[in-house]
Regions:
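Ankyrin repeat boundary/linker residues
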Residues: 40, 73, 106, 139-140, ...
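Ankyrin repeat A-helix N-terminal signature
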Residues: 49-54, 82-88, 115-121, 149-155, ...
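Ankyrin-repeat inter-repeat connecting loop/turn
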Residues: 69, 102, 135-136, 169, ...
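Bacterial N-terminal signal peptides
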Residues: 11-24
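Intrinsically disordered, low-complexity regulatory segments in ankyrin-centric signaling systems
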Residues: 22-65, 74-77, 235, 239
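Leucine-rich solenoid repeat scaffolds
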Residues: 208-239
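Ankyrin repeat structural motif
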Residues: 55-63, 88-96, 121-130, 155-163, ...
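Start-of-repeat signature of ankyrin repeats
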Residues: 43, 76, 109, 142-143, ...
Length: 239
């Protein structure tokens, strides 16, 4: 099961107040973001196919022949999206050199930075950010950010990169959650989610933004029995 499919299942289940036993059903039903299937990949043509293969010579050849570097294929994906899913970093560099837009949103409103962040693909994310891709876009049906998605999944290395790149720390999505809140309510309280929360605290994230019910991050961590997260929040002065 893809990380996007799992992630969106948790998001929707939590929003609807469902038990964890229902998450699997929601997960299957959610319209989730997944990379090209083998059959979809085999059907790619032109720059999309070259991006999927990591064929930089073909990318350069097609770009020189004025191929549209931002052309959209299935699901509204550009060659940049395809290369990101396939972890083809040299292809991303070639596409950027040819003038491709690194910040295009596909049909489900995901950009390359969010795709790499959810995949916990720190190397591809590092390349994208170095090429000038934005960490600040509002993405997904939840009006979230790459940082919120990464915090939700406990991708602490990704979170640190995004913070360094200037991602908005206190963005509130349409579930009324911030990255801090998602690291708690959609996390497992374990090592990586603790490291994620610590990175957000160290960066100066607001620890007192409440969720839709008026609960603070500290109250949410206490309610879940996440003692180590409670300690982190209390040490940082959370109320």
């Amino acid at each position: 099961m893809s990380l996007f499919r799992r992630a969106e299942g948790w998001w929707l289940a939590a929003w609807l107040g469902l038990s964890t036993g229902c998450v699997g059903l929601i997960t299957q039903a959610a319209l989730a973001q997944v990379g090209p299937s083998p059959s979809e990949a085999a059907a790619l043509t032109g720059l999309h196919a070259a991006a999927h293969r990591g064929d930089t010579a073909q990318i350069e050849k097609l770009a020189a022949a004025k191929a549209d570097t931002n052309a959209k294929a299935g699901h509204g994906r550009t060659p940049v999206h395809v290369a990101t899913f396939a972890r083809q970093r040299d292809a991303l560099k070639a596409l950027a050199k040819a003038g491709a837009d690194l910040n295009v949103l596909e049909n489900d409103r995901y950009d390359a930075v969010t795709i790499a962040s959810v995949a916990d693909d720190e190397e591809t994310l590092r390349v994208l950010l170095a090429l000038g891709a934005s960490s600040k876009q509002t993405t997904s049906r939840y009006d979230g950010t790459a940082l919120i998605a990464a915090a939700h999944l406990g991708h602490d290395g990704v979170v640190r990169q995004l913070i360094q790149a200037g991602a908005p720390l206190d963005h509130v999505n349409n579930l009324h959650w911030t990255a801090v809140i998602e690291s708690i309510v959609l996390g497992d309280g374990g090592r990586r989610h603790q490291a994620t929360l610590k990175a957000l605290i160290d960066a100066g994230a607001n620890l007192n933004v409440t969720d839709r019910t008026g609960s603070t991050p500290l109250q949410l961590a206490r309610a879940r029995g996440y003692a180590d997260m409670v300690k982190l929040l209390q040490a940082a002065g959370a109320k």
